Amino acid sequence: MSAILKFIRENHILAVIEQAIAKKKSRLSLNSFEISEIPSLLYSCLEVEHLYLHINNITSVPVQITQLLNLTTLTLDYNNISSLPAEIGNLKNLINLNISYNPLHILIPEIGDLENLEAFWCNRIGLREIPKEIGKLSKLDTFGARGNELKTIPKEMTVLTKLRWLTLEYNQIESLPPCMDNMESLVHCNIKQNRLKEFPASVLKCPELMYLQLNHNQISHLPDGFDAIPTPSLEMIDLRHNPICELPHPEHSLVRYTEEIPSVVVQDLTPSSSSRGHGAQALAANATALRLPAVPAPRHADPLMIDIEIDGSSIEDSEDWENSVNSSELDVQYQSDDERADNEAVGMVLPELSRYATTAS
């Protein structure tokens, strides 16, 4: 990067932070700025609640970030961060945390101190083990750890009675804890592309379960008494690309064995009045039902979404519990008219900065 461009970018970042401090903004977007080191000025933004630092070149997270005690949303995904400070557990108000796509390899136990955390994404961080302290996150609603190197799931995770969205696809998981049915709020469970040999029967006993994705595993048979297990909310079990598909197997209206969905299942996948009510109630209760952990949607009318591509469905009518989303779709931001005006004002200053930079060089 030329000295001029670096000068302009660095001063633009500082100008954005200074405006946030002066106006006591609750939202600060510093994503996609090619930041390699978090500016120390940022730690003076004591009013900030939503801090977006994703898609940068950040290599470390200084302990000073824990001075921002009002943080409810923190996005650090798509950086080059190799460790988190133990003091991150001091961010007691944090609700949404995304650390995906960083070479972290471990989750520090202090993650369990984030007592208000509701949405936690740690996709593709080279994770080999989920710490047992995950069980302390009693308010956790959404957890994603896809594309890691996990072989087991700690039994402590099964005490998360408010967890509704669990996606652990593309790992090396060989079995699940036997008491998965303790997760009484679980709606979506995605364990596809793992190494499961036994059908996790206890998951079926989760009373709110709608979608169970087990495709691309090593399952060869359904559990004994499968038809007798009560599944009041279940919409579909995906067993495609398992050995069971190549063997004689019992047909079941809710089980998908092939690429072609049986007509009965298609009908089941169309939300009934009861399932629509379930989805609406879920969305009203918590925006993380949409897996959009940046901002709880009900607090923002007619939001403008930026730096994201989603399927176009509105917040009100989306009940897509079946499909998982990519990490790039998790950092949803909203800008008010005032915030857009501020950004435009900063942009008008850049030509002047460029002139001074030319002189300096």
Region annotations inferred by a language model:
Residues 1-170, 174-178, 185-188, 201, ...:
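The feature captures the LRR N-terminal capping module
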